């Protein structure tokens, strides 16, 4: 009888001891947290607000792929010089990879070549620097996108009329590739082409206002979202406003498209662009030196088709 009582007391106690040991040791928990990959993200302009959806895609990819992002935004007037300094600093700090949105392809090529040769991989977004050693470029086919915008503007600008192209890029980028392609299409179709460039530190709105006082364009074309937003803000509500076309799919751009201030836009999935860019940077950090990525699809969207399901995904992305 005593033995039976003893067993009844000891067995539960042993069970509790085993349970306690299992809880304290927790074999399912790694003894040390897995180290995150460090990826530095360098924007090309001081105002990065138009990259907000792409940034959400980057952050989601970082969460999914066990990476940590450091966002760096140039603050000075010489964007290329500041990006060079940031590239060198981040490479020296030991970051695992750099995601670069170049402000000037030619000015940054040597720096990219030097740091990639020294072992820090670089992936670019929007502007291709693979010839300088970057592992990959994520973005649309800029020439095709520019041609599409040029063809769209042909519909609103009669033969012989003037089309003004907004030129705010400080150097050679994917944005200037778009502009060059659009200009070639317009000139081949018998349209006059002018360019609007800010001078002496003026903003784009002032430059466009100045341009409109001396020119009477039938259409204006912008080649990135920031320029398109500013042009739309200036032209909104003006009775004599030229037709406005451009690249970009921000919430502000969508609002102006709905109001018919913007006639047509070339839009791509910005969330996907950001996600794929970080994914490529993770691949590069893992040792894949170079790899080919298909260009991102873009779509021409007008007010009348902006609420079609596929276009809604571009203009009003649902993020996790």
Predicted segments — roles?
Residues 138-162, 249-253, 269-286:
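Hydrophobic alpha-helical segments within soluble ligand-binding/sensing domains
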Residues 8, 272, 276-320:
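Hinge/cleft segment of the Venus flytrap/periplasmic-binding protein
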Residues 70-92, 194-214, 228-230:
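Structural motif
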Residues 99-116, 199-254:
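Hydrophobic alpha-helical
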Residues 39-56, 61, 70-81, 105:
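Extracytoplasmic "Venus flytrap"
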Residues 107-144, 250-258:
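Flexible loop/hinge segments that line or gate small-molecule binding clefts
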Residues 8-24:
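Hydrophobic membrane-insertion alpha-helices, especially the h-region
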